[in-house]
Amino acid sequence: MSFRLDAASVSYANGQRALSQITLAASRGEPIAVIGPSGAGKTSLLRLLATSLRPSEGRVEVLEQSPWAVSAARLQQLRCRIGMVHQAPPMPPRQRVVTAILAGRLGIWPAWKSLLSLVYPADIDGAGEQLARLELADRLFDRCDQLSGGQLQRVGVARVLYQRPELILADEPVSAMDPVLANLTLGELRREADTRAVPLVASLHAVDLALRWFPRIVGLKAGEIAFDLPAERVTDALLRELYASESASPPVQGSQALTSIAAGASAAIGGDTQPRPACR
């Protein structure tokens, strides 16, 4: 297993419980989408898998290691094997895009190479290749504060693609993108995960994107798993129940009606990592 959570819970110092009794596992190369209303615990779940949150109860294993039972040095080594795409990528505003992407390997390269790359980028071609996959190659030498929110998100994805981690986690990676770029970006994440047989876990606001690109859907509600099902078994009724606390229908990226979301899930995945023309 690439990761396993057994009855894992997370409680904060103020007593608020973010996750409750989460049992979840993924095998090598398995893509999983996590959906649910705001405050359901999606980000907390990803942070738990990234080993940036420690469980208050239960057991966590990531890449065949127990993060909280190893030394600080081994924990740092484990974290270098995990790639995290943030909704708002943590990049210094004045940092160049090329440097931001190469930072994906700072924990892997020798210290001297990491330090030198901050001044003289060590692999300009490699960074450019990842940007080109996301149609952003022309911004390689721009500063991060010159980019839009969606462009910054693509830089964050490019950094993880360049890192080549053994576990890819993505927290709302396309929330600032239009439907065309969102599909392009998720397609590249899927392609990377499929090609290298590494697990990909992404939290997504848009239900239609989750069903389009991921064969397994985990629904979170109030910090608990509401369902864990193949995409083709996620029905409109399940989605309405999951989002019952929100005033609107389950959120979608485009104009697709809720009644057509689950019906098209099986055809959208089927091993093909190209989006259907209707969404482009």
From Swiss-Prot:
Gene3D superfamilies: P-loop containing nucleotide triphosphate hydrolases. Keywords: ATP-binding, Cell inner membrane, Cell membrane, Membrane, Nucleotide-binding, Phosphonate transport, Translocase, Transport. InterPro entries: AAA+_ATPase, ABC_transporter-like_ATP-bd, ABC_transporter-like_CS, MetN_ABC_transporter-like, P-loop_NTPase. One of its GO terms (cellular component) is plasma membrane. It is an enzyme of class 7 (translocase). It is found in: Cell inner membrane. Residues 3-247 form the ABC transporter domain. ATP binds at residues 36-43. Disulfide bonds: none annotated. It is a peripheral membrane protein. One of its GO terms (molecular function) is ABC-type phosphonate transporter activity. It catalyses: phosphonate(out) + ATP + H2O = phosphonate(in) + ADP + phosphate + H(+). Its EC number is 7.3.2.2. Pfam families: ABC_tran (PF00005). PANTHER family: AMINO ACID IMPORT ATP-BINDING PROTEIN, PHOSPHONATES IMPORT ATP-BINDING PROTEIN PHNC. Part of the ABC transporter complex PhnCDE involved in phosphonates import. Responsible for energy coupling to the transport system. This is Phosphonates import ATP-binding protein PhnC 1. The gene is phnC1.
